[in-house]
Amino acid sequence: MSKLVLVLNCGSSSLKFAVVDAESGAEHLTGLAECLGLPEARMKWKLDGKHEAQLGAGAAHVEALSFMVETILASKPELKANLGAIGHRIVHGGEQFTKSALITDEVLKGIQDAATFAPLHNPAHIIGIEAAKANFPGLKNVAVFDTAFHQTMPEESYLYALPYNLYKEHGIRRYGMHGTSHLFITREVAGLLNKPVEEVNIINCHLGNGASVCAIKNGESVDTSMGLTPLEGLVMGTRCGDIDPAIVFHLHDALGYSVEQINNMLTKESGLQGLTQVTSDCRFVEDNYGEKEEATRAMDVFCHRLAKYVAGYTATLEGRLDAITFTGGIGENSAPIREMVLNRLGIFGIEVDGEANLKARFGGEGTITTANSRIPAMVISTNEELVIAEDTAKLAGL
């Protein structure tokens, strides 16, 4: 039976897709539909070369998936015919899902219930699942949850110091995100260090427009920076990360902001965007560091916050840290940010290898610390699609 898996990642206004061989890891098709629901809705994909098409004003997830099936896959009938199953990235699974699951009506309801904590993402996931079922009625669908990897966190890590009944009755706790990426990096480090996954202790920094740090002990997540939602933790592209909660009351009561305005500010106007008041693009911050005040300010705050998290998470690993790892768009490509963060961790005996750090960009990987460094730091390209494909193939019986 074919182990080709169609991997779907439905964002609030995007659809990322790939056809992945779960056995070899080869990607036969990759693509992205973006600006969905807007006049400029479009799709880009790679299949025998690069292609791009306009989807039509207002095209949404259903139209994007239909275009992918009827136009892109139709041009490669053998690829479509050999699809074995469909895997869906699901941002939030609440406490119900501790691992990936074959999608049933009950699982679909669980995804809907968890939408309270991911109102932009989970409803889009459900649309993607329903559209996939309609277009491929004979294929099994599997949900792979970003939150599942973090379900091993101890109570001391996931509880907030709020009235306990808020957790027991309403599920208000830390859930964490990027679990699929953190899991992939854990497995990769195990291979690089020639250790069983169950013996790996790392701190992984997944840095992109959304960013999180995860402390991984004996191959399991024991703490992570994102919380109930993806808003908590690090400075991100447009998200604020950690702030004093009373700022919300001050904005509302003293400055007259509405709840909707505050929500929009914290999620879409903060982070690098807020600190620079120019852009959320980390490349601007990196390229103009030391020359433009706004870029310098943003990069210093970003690196300070990240270094604090990494240092703090050493306390969860009980004396052994095998490696600090960097992944994600920024983690894999920004040598200056990696160096600034690691230099702030000099107390741990970390020494950056400047040449190796510069080489580890644009697909380059490897150790970026010297042989004398007490703790190695590594750059590893993440591959969430492969994890989703592997889990899907296993649960679908491919």
Swiss-Prot record:
Its cofactor is Mg(2+); Mn(2+). GO terms for molecular function: acetate kinase activity; ATP binding; magnesium ion binding. It is found in: Cytoplasm. The active site is at D146 (proton donor/acceptor). It is an enzyme of class 2 (transferase). PROSITE patterns: ACETATE_KINASE_1, ACETATE_KINASE_2. ATP binds at K16, H206, L207, G208, N209, G210, D281, C282, R283, G329, I330, G331, E332, N333. The keyword Magnesium applies. GO terms for cellular component: cytosol. Mg(2+). Can also accept Mn(2+). It catalyses: acetate + ATP = acetyl phosphate + ADP. Substrate binds at R89. InterPro entries: Ac/propionate_kinase (IPR004372), Aliphatic_acid_kin_short-chain (IPR000890), Aliphatic_acid_kinase_CS (IPR023865), ATPase_NBD (IPR043129). The record marks H178, R239 as: Transition state stabilizer. One of its GO terms (biological process) is acetate metabolic process. Pfam families: Acetate_kinase. Mg(2+) binds at N9, E384. NCBIfam families: ackA (TIGR00016). Belongs to the acetokinase family. This is Acetate kinase 1. It comes from Aliivibrio fischeri (strain ATCC 700601 / ES114). The lineage of its organism: Bacteria, Pseudomonadati, Pseudomonadota, Gammaproteobacteria, Vibrionales.
